[in-house]
Each structure stands twice: as C-alpha cells, then as structure tokens.
Amino acid sequence: MKAVLGLEDGTVIKGTGFGAEGTACGELVFTTQFTGYEEALTDPSYKGQILMFTYPLIGNYGVSGERFQSDNIHAEGLVVREACKKPYHYKSTRSIHKFLEDEGKPGIEGVDTRMLTIGAREHGTMRAALITGSDDGEEAVDMARNFPQVTDEELIARVTCKEPRFIPGAAGAWKGSGKPKHAVVVDLGIKRNIINNLHKRGIDLTLVPATTKPEEIAGYEPDMLFISNGPGDPEKATDAINAVKAFAGTIPVAGICFGHQIISLAMGARTYKLKFGHRGGNQPVKDLIENKIFISSQNHGYAVDADSLEGTGLYVKYLNANDKTVEGVSHKDLDIFSVQFHPEAQAGPLDTEETFFGKVVKVLGGGL
C-alpha cells in the first residue's frame, strides 16, 4: 500500500503503508523506547500526536493486549523504519499491522526515522500528515500546514472519563491505621498502570472527569487529590488547576506528568513547550535531595519553568540529568508533590515506582 508523510516545513517522505487506509494529522513526536509499543500507542497522552519510534524494528513480539494503558489506540498514526511482518510471542494474538487496522489507525514504514529525529532535535517538533493509500506529498504537506497547533487543540475532552467511577482499593492491601484512605483522581487521560499502582496499595479511588468543579470534588470527602497524566497544553486544564488551588493546604495533592505541570501552574509557576520533548524509557533524573540518579520513563512536551518556582513554596526535587529541566517538585511546608516522569512505567524502568507511590501512601498515613 502506498503511503506518504508530509511535514509543515515541506518535507515529504514516501514509504509503505500498513494498518488502516486513511489519513492522520498531528504533531510528529519521537520516542526512544526499544519496546513498549503497545503501552505507548494506547497511552492517552499521545492523543493528537503521530508517534515515531527511533528503534528500527517495531512489532517483534506482536500484540497481546495485557499491557494496554487504555482500551484504544490514542496516537493518531505510527511511523517506523520497519514493522515486523511475522511477530512471535506466546501471548501474541495479532500483529502490529492488524492492531492498527482494527483500530482504524494508519502506519508508514520504510522511513528514515533517524533523519527525522535529528531534524526534530535541530528544528523542533512539527505538524505532520500521514496518508496511506496515496503518495501525494503535496496534499500531505498542505494538510500538515492547515492542522491546528497543539496549543490550539482541545485534547483533554477527548480522553477524560465521561462519568465519575469508584474503584475500591485492593482488599487487605492498605498498610496503615484505620480504614483505607480515599483519593479523588482528576482523569485527564490517566494511564491504566497509575490506577493499578494506587489500587494495589489499598487506596480507594474515585475517578472524576476533567471538568469536575472543586465543590463536586469536596462532596466525595477525599483524603487526597491526585492529578493524572494527559495530552496537550497544561494551561488549558483550567478546571484541574482550580481544583488544586481549592484543596492545596487542606489535603495532600499529588500528580504525575501533566498533573505535575498543572500543580505547578496552580501554585503560581509557569510552564513552557519543549523543543522536542522527552519520550522514552531511558531518561536519567537526579534526586537533588538524596543525591541519587534514577532512570525513568517519560512522555511530555511541556516542562515547568524552574525560575518561576520562586515564591510558590515549591522547590525542585528532581532534575533531568540531560538538559537540566525540572522533573519533579515538592512543597516546603505542605503535602504537595509531583513528578514529570512516569514512576508507574509501562513501559520502562521501575526505579522510581516505590519512591513515588510509597510517598503517596506515607502522606495518607499508611506504610506502618
């Protein structure tokens, strides 16, 4: 099947299509993950983006569905050097080609992904259009140029839950005095493994939509407010920002990735768009308090401005060891903390899982 990838700067790359026949538009981003394509494609944080893998062969072990981070593919399309035609794994039920086809998502292979990655690092991420069933480069470039910027898109509404949902903590798992604690989780596109990590520690959860007002959250009588990961520009998550403002100082507040940015904004800091973002499972972060290095899984295109933290009560807890951007903050006096990386991994290393989720349990009075 014919396929073409067009970028807003006029770059045209022709290749071979796989998956569904059709068109995908979005911001072209790259990840350095070697594996974990099931998790990445189903991560709601990739909504509005075309995902490109730098690793040259993707799909080797097929698709099982056991590690999906949501029910569906959220990336708009897939760009790879080569898609494996004959995957093998005893749990595999279909190929990556069939997975994309079933989900109505296009893919393109035969692409020099390293060249595109270097271009993104030098010039920044760009809007792109991926067309399968056609190799009309001019059409692809026009579509890319006319597609909205990520800052203009309303992505959160496309991934948040529609109704509140209660998830009881795992029976007998809460290690603390009294009954299990209850966290209200603002769902901005939460990954399944974040839910799993809170659940397996015995914490009762109420997932609420992104537009939930502070007074509605208060009605659930939470012991903690938790802000999830999600796609797009954090400044658009105004309801979540207002929720943090309302509960900061009254109950513990924690967040991951997008949630980290929202907490920082709510406390008075600023965020900015990175040139090409951090995406992959090999990102080193330094704990400035413990003087330790961890390898983390990351997926974000925005970061918190370190200089803007002055006067907010927040301090930098974690720093990216590569580019020195903020990877986590804590409050000097209040139980407010967040990380930019993904301690729950899926995919990626588990170096920081217990560090982060153990702290969640601790501030709730558990871990005794």
Curated annotation (Swiss-Prot):
Whichever gene encodes this chain, its name is carA
Where are the catalytic residues? C257, H342, E344
Cite the InterPro entries for this sequence: Anth_synth/Amidotransfase (IPR050472), CarbamoylP_synth_ssu (IPR006274), CarbamoylP_synth_ssu_N (IPR002474), CarbP_synth_ssu_N_sf (IPR036480), Class_I_gatase-like (IPR029062), CPSase_GATase1 (IPR035686), GATASE (IPR017926)
In the record, the note on similarity to other proteins reads: Belongs to the CarA family.
Question: What is this enzyme's class at the first EC digit?
Answer: ligase
One Pfam family per UniProt:
CPSase_sm_chain
MF terms from GO for this chain are: ATP binding; carbamoyl-phosphate synthase (glutamine-hydrolyzing) activity; glutaminase activity
Q: Which Gene3D superfamilies does this UniProt record tie to the protein?
A: 3.40.50.880, Carbamoyl-phosphate synthase small subunit, N-terminal domain
Q: How does it assemble?
A: Composed of two chains; the small (or glutamine) chain promotes the hydrolysis of glutamine to ammonia, which is used by the large (or ammonia) chain to synthesize carbamoyl phosphate. Tetramer of heterodimers (alpha,beta)4.
Instruction: Provide the E.C. number(s) assigned to this enzyme.
Output: 6.3.5.5
Keywords recorded for this protein, A-Z: Amino-acid biosynthesis, Arginine biosynthesis, ATP-binding, Glutamine amidotransferase, Ligase, Nucleotide-binding, Pyrimidine biosynthesis
**Name of this protein:** Carbamoyl phosphate synthase small chain
Q: Which GO terms describe its biological process?
A: 'de novo' pyrimidine nucleobase biosynthetic process; 'de novo' UMP biosynthetic process; glutamine metabolic process; L-arginine biosynthetic process
Q: Where is this region: CPSase?
A: 1-178
